[in-house]
Amino acid sequence: MAMKRAKVVFTCGISLLALCAVAAVFGTTNTIGQQGKVARVDWMSKLPDSTEISQLNIPGTHDTLALYGLADFSGQCQSLDVKQQLRIGVRFLDVRLKQIGNKLRAVHGFVDQKESFDFVVKELESFLKENPKETLFISVKEDDKAESPAFSFEECLNTYLKDEFWYTSDTMPQTLGQVRGKMVLLTRYDDGNKGVNMADKWQDCGSFSLDDFYIQDEYIIDDIEAKKAAILACSEKDSTYRLNFFSGYFRKGFPPSNAPSVAKIINPWAIKALPQMNKRGVCLFDFITSELMDAYFGGQA
């Protein structure tokens, strides 16, 4: 969640901890990745190079690196580290960072995640070296602003973007063959000049169109049934690409930032609902599990 939105909620009297709460493959028909036997660690290797990115179903995680919370109830969104997530099939990573000097560090709002981006990138590069036919989609967001930085956020990010591993065009790749063994960069920070820019038109807490994308990110939840309806509605949209966030927090919950509160309801529901969703797009989950991945891939082993 953006630092701006965190400040707004905080000034409204809701603890910033609430914003650290626990809290789709792209396309219109999206049948690829649902049928047949798929080995999760290299499931993309079974697909032809000609596979259109817009026809893929891609499982992802919201706040991918948020393994730690404040006082054990705020900030954590995942229980599996990035290496474990990749091995069970996750391919869209929602990365939240803070600039410290000329380096980047994983955060969720103001909650430090005890991980440097240097280490994370090495893990991602290592995975792609071992699985060169896979592709990762990396959304990078500046989740906490640095105080009077000597370098811009993107200048720091550029030091991590090796051409060997990164696809940094401002348009989405057309086919899987274009980006095998690479990370496709999507950006959610101000004044970005690399990657697919999502920041300029991103709306806070809603369902909206953004260029070729349709995005459902209704993260403030008063009615869990309304959240389910928003997820299902997103899955039926005819946009070229879809990002469908299954994550969120209860505005009126107590404590308001209780990390597993939404996931405890949404994830079991998703396990039943996902096999019926033909057009999944990119689905981003809190507390991803192998059971969720089984449902996402239609019960494949």
Cite the ranges covered by each PLM segment.
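N-terminal Sec-pathway targeting helices
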Residues: M1-S15
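Hydrophobic membrane-insertion alpha-helices, especially the h-region
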Residues: C12-A24
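Long, acidic (Asp/Glu-rich), low-complexity accessory segments flanking structured domains
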Residues: A23-I88, F92, G101-E130, T135, ...
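Conserved, mostly hydrophobic/aromatic
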Residues: R96, I138, L185, C283
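An acidic- and aromatic-residue-enriched active-site/binding cleft used to recognize and process polar
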Residues: L97-I100, K141-D143, D190, I288
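Active-site groove signature of glycoside hydrolases
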Residues: Q99, P132-E147
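Short, electropositive alpha-helical surface patch
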Residues: S148-Y160
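Surface-exposed substrate-engagement region within the catalytic domains
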Residues: E164-P275
